[in-house]
């Protein structure tokens, strides 16, 4: 029987990859070589999309704020400028949440922005 050098390390590495590939379709969860490629690619997708998610949510918040602002007779850019001039520091996430859940509070902020821009 030939001597095996690093056999336990190799087995551990392969088991780790196959564990990460659990739930993949077809041979991607059983064959090491294919599973390794799939796991590497999924890691690339995960890395890319963690950054993409931040952009997607910001786009969603801006869309919601713009829709609510236009219902109050303002564009998104004028609303944001008015809030900045008025000294109201509310981030886009909170503004979007107010626009969806509490329209009255958002209207008050929009009115404050209108007054600040009018000055």
Swiss-Prot record:
InterPro entries: Ribosomal_bL20, RIBOSOMAL_L20_CS, Ribosomal_protein_bL20_C
UniProt keyword annotation of Ribosomal protein present: yes
GO cellular component, one term: ribosome
The keyword Ribosomal protein appears for this protein: yes
GO molecular function: rRNA binding; structural constituent of ribosome
Gene Ontology biological-process entries: ribosomal large subunit assembly; translation
SUPFAM superfamilies (UniProt xref): Ribosomal protein L20 (SSF74731)
Keywords of the record: Ribonucleoprotein, Ribosomal protein, RNA-binding, rRNA-binding
Function of the molecule: Binds directly to 23S ribosomal RNA and is necessary for the in vitro assembly process of the 50S ribosomal subunit. It is not involved in the protein synthesizing functions of that subunit.
UniProt record similarity statement: Belongs to the bacterial ribosomal protein bL20 family.
Record protein name field: Large ribosomal subunit protein bL20
Source organism of the structure: Lysinibacillus sphaericus (strain C3-41)
């Amino acid at each position: 029987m030939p001597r095996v050098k690093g056999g336990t390390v190799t087995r551990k590495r392969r088991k780790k990859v196959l564990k990460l590939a659990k739930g993949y379709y077809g041979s991607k969860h059983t064959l090491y070589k294919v599973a390794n490629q799939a796991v590497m690619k999924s890691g690339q997708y995960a890395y890319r999309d963690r950054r993409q998610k931040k952009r997607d949510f910001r786009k969603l918040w801006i869309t919601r704020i713009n829709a609510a602002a236009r219902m109050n007779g303002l564009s998104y850019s004028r609303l944001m400028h008015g809030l900045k001039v008025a000294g109201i520091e509310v981030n886009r996430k909170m503004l979007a949440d107010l626009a969806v859940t509490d329209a009255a509070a958002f209207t008050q902020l929009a009115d404050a922005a209108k007054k600040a821009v009018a000055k």
